Every structure is written in structure tokens, then in C-alpha cells.
Amino acid sequence: MIRSRDAVYARPDLPKLKHSLGRVEMSLAGALEPRRVLVADNDPLTSRMLSEIAEKEGYQVVSVSDGREAYRTLMADADFRIAIFNMTMPNLRGLDIVRYMKTEKRLMRIPVLVVSGDPGLKQMADSFAAGATMFLPKPLTQDQLQRTLRIALASREAKRQFPHAA
């Protein structure tokens, strides 16, 4: 079991992207894009904390309380910079939504952060296998989430600038 409180786990391909970030300049289109994040967590306290931290980072937050609501939200509106899903939610699991997102062209560009109260290696591996960009064990710290949002956004911009890299 992983016990580091400040741990942020990223897919293996992210270090390559992180390395090239110094050369990435945000495009005008990227700068004008709304900074929206979808937060889906069935725990009201965690959802509120995630939303408040994202808002402090300048994001507009759309918050839902279960997987089915997250799915419906994405079907109606795919204009999110980042999605944060609890691994296990009622009605539809976070990992099931991630798998679906990776099959839809309009959704696959959205980086997904999976949060879990169970920080085991299996949960982390399952998250990455489903297509998550990052895995965050609970309890989360404000600093940890802020850093993660910045890395995920930079990763997305790098992929936009260099679509055939990594």
C-alpha cells in the first residue's frame, strides 16, 4: 500500500511530456478556451474541497454527485479542460466513464484525474489501464491537487502542440 500523503501518480508517458513542456507555448486558441473542470464525487465533502481548489486555480467547476450524472454531463457538453472522477461512485463507476471517454473522439482529449480512498497499486494500475491521466490517493491536500491540475493542463497543451509526440 502506498502511504505518501503528497504523492501524485502519473501515467508513464507523462514524464516525456513534462520534459518537453519548456518548449510548449500556449496557443491563442488554448488561451481563449474556457477553463472548465468536471468534478464527479459522491462524497459531498470531497466534492466541495475539489471544487473549491479548482476554483482557486481559476477553473469554472461543474460538480455532480454520481457516475450517471457525470456521463450525462459529458454527453451534453464536452467542453472541459480536465475531469476529476472518484474511482467508485453510485450508478456508474469512475473507471467506466474513463473507458467510455477513450472511445469518443470528442472526449478523449480531456485529461482525467482519478481519486480513490484506496491508494493501492491495483487501483492505480486499473486507473491507468482504463485511460486515466493521473491517480490521486485520498486524502488529498490542496497543494497536491493544485500541482496535479497544473501538470494535467500542461500535458494537454503539450499534446495539442505536438499531437504526434510521445
Where are the predicted features?
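The feature encodes the CheY-like receiver
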Residues: S47, M89-N91, M108, G120
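Charged docking surfaces used in two-component/phosphorelay signaling
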Residues: R48-K56
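Acidic, metal-coordinating helix/loop segments flanking the phosphotransfer/catalytic sites
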Residues: S63-I82
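Acidic catalytic/metal-coordinating carboxylates
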Residues: S65-E69, N86, R93-R99
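Short amphipathic alpha-helix used as the core "switch/output" element in two-component signaling
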Residues: R72, L95-M108
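Alpha4 helix (beta4-alpha4-beta5 surface) of REC/receiver domains from two-component response regulators
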Residues: D96, P119-M134
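C-terminal output helix
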Residues: L140-R150
